[in-house]
Curated annotation (Swiss-Prot):
Disulfide bonds join 1-6. Its main location: secreted. It comes from Squalus acanthias (Spiny dogfish). Belongs to the vasopressin/oxytocin family. This is Valitocin.
């Protein structure tokens, strides 16, 4: 993911 609030990287 490109966002910090992503449950799984």
């Amino acid at each position: 993911c490109y966002i910090q609030n992503c449950p799984v990287g």
